[in-house]
């Protein structure tokens, strides 16, 4: 009788132990119930800056941040490949909203708008600051324009419009990144197509390619080339130039008369393993602490309580903004990139 009781007790104990271990393992694997655990953070933005954002979040909140850095198009392709078993939780950055808009119908971004941005209109001052269905929200403002080397170009001689780049005096002195690889350059191409029409747009880029001495794959490379004197003019975002200037390089920036001014967004990854942690990370990016890090890297913060460290603010640049036809972008994003490859590579 005693042996039988011992046997039953042992069986019940073992069963309870197995159930407990299984439950614990499930909690550790998901990390999604309370936001604790690892948060996988996909970003093409400056690796050191993105790492700093992750570290600051870890200081302030539970959970660890695993930063996964790659180019925008590489990350989008990765999320598409992982669609049936998502590995990321948050996707931040891609040279503005266009890659995010193109990704909405791909089923790789989920719906989440932080409380901080819930009262924003979808479009503020002519700039789309969040997705109408909550698929992304802007965390900073990017201005596409011209970096120039102040030792090689006088301020009053620097180009002020996109047509100025075709001036013969800049032949062999301009760099812009490769639209087949760079989200920054894709924005440049799509904008010109929308403003000029496709026939005139392709003619414009045929001339611009002849002006360039290089088309590197990285969106930041033309500005770095300007800082080293390898180019007089480089097409890029504002923060790229001001970051170089802050390092003591001979670089300044021109906001063209009419140019893309857009937010750089963040999205929750659809079906990611730690959605609650991902939401907390997005909240952090819009908080004063997160926005201050972006400002320290010379990005224009979207939170009005954080001061820009560059001469530019949303208020100062909004009059330069062009109207971007987002529906046209969604319909033509991949096609225009492929046509660029066929025409110029």
Residue ranges and their predicted role:
Residues 43-51, 70, 87-230:
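Extracytoplasmic ligand-binding site segments that recognize negatively charged/polar headgroups
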Residues 311-345:
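Extracellular/periplasmic bilobal clamshell ligand-binding domains
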Residues 145-152, 190, 263-275, 285, ...:
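A bilobed periplasmic-binding-protein/Venus flytrap-type ligand-binding module shared by bacterial periplasmic
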Residues 97-102, 227, 231-250:
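A ligand-binding cleft/hinge motif common to bilobed small-molecule-binding domains
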Residues 142, 172-177, 204-209, 215-216, 247-270, 285-308, ...:
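Periplasmic-binding protein-like
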Residues 1-39:
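Short, low-complexity disordered leader/linker segments with a strong preference
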Residues 25-26, 33-101:
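Early extracytoplasmic/lumenal segment of secretory-pathway proteins
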